[in-house]
Regions:
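Active-site hotspot residues in diverse enzymes, especially metal/ion-binding acidic/histidine motifs
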Residues: 1-295
Length: 295
């Protein structure tokens, strides 16, 4: 589980409910239980840090979850959400930080067994998103927003339809249909990777996700999309270029560490408590928190 010895003696006061694994996840029952326990432990420590600092988690709003049934409803929902969160129809900054600013607890874990992300609720109060730390920049952003879709979209469809709606939601959050059409124009016959790389670099969305969106909007034909998939499958050099991330490091969050640091600076917790919350040794804690001055 990658936890300290102290973990086994901690009292767990937080119960995890309504955790829905991403359909793409290939976690078996043992791995799923291990992930659930890591989530349980992290959320407990997260809430303890919140309590120590007096910070409140903002509510995501009474308008969510929302019932949607088709593509048009998803586009409308994303516009409404961006307006409510005051993020506009522009390239999104750090997606994880945006989610945390609006009441979502985001947890990153180390797992290499086909797990991308999951979402759910803690005690039916706090929405959570769990991400595989090893995902690259574009994949982590898309997965985080896909899981946000699971939180904000009412479950009134079968699993396959929900996955499709969440994929549409994530893509629309990263770059709206209107914005993409403004950039690329109308229907085209050919696809030039250079142009898509520019959009990828500006909006933090993968080339594959862009091409899927272009097919859906009719910018490229279904046959052109299939031809691209075939070429990518057979051309290692193309595949490597398409799947190359625009950034060497994926997005992450420093909110939890910053909360513990603030609690420590307020003398709300001891150094040993800070180390326990962060699940690190005292030596690592001293290396992490180097005071510049004391009053």
């Amino acid at each position: 589980l990658n936890v300290t010895f102290d973990y086994f003696f901690r009292q767990h006061t937080v119960s995890i409910g309504k955790v829905a694994f991403n359909k793409k996840s290939s976690l078996n029952a043992i791995d799923a239980k291990a992930v659930s326990e890591m989530v349980r432990d992290h959320v407990e420590r997260y809430l303890e840090a919140l309590q120590a600092t007096g910070v409140k988690i903002p509510a995501i709003g009474e308008m969510w979850p929302k019932s949607v049934g088709d593509e048009r409803a998803i586009v409308s929902m994303v516009k409404e959400l961006k307006q409510a969160w005051n993020i506009g129809d522009y390239a999104l900054g750090n997606v994880i930080e945006i989610l945390e600013q609006h009441g979502i607890i985001v947890i990153e874990i180390d797992n290499s067994n086909g797990f991308d992300g999951l979402s759910g609720w803690v005690d039916d109060i706090y929405p959570i998103i769990v991400l595989n730390r090893s995902l690259n920049y574009e994949s982590k952003r898309l997965t985080a927003l896909h899981e946000l879709g699971h939180i904000l979209i009412s479950v009134e469809h079968d699993a396959r339809k929900i996955e499709k709606l969440c994929n549409l939601f994530a893509g629309e959050m990263l770059i709206s249909d209107e914005r993409l059409i403004d950039i690329l124009g109308g229907k085209v016959k050919g696809i030039f990777i250079n142009e898509l790389e520019n959009v990828r670099d500006s909006y933090g969305i993968s080339i594959d996700a862009l091409l899927f969106k272009m097919k859906r909007l009719g910018i490229i034909s279904k046959s052109a999309f299939r031809a691209y998939q075939q070429k990518k499958s057979n051309d290692e050099e193309l595949r490597a270029r398409v799947e190359q991330s625009s950034k060497a490091k994926a997005e992450t969050s420093h909110k939890f560490v910053n909360m513990v640091c603030r609690a420590l600076s307020l003398d709300a917790i001891s150094s040993s408590k800070a180390a326990s919350l962060l699940n690190i040794s005292m030596v690592d804690l001293r290396a992490l928190f180097t005071p510049l001055a004391e009053s």
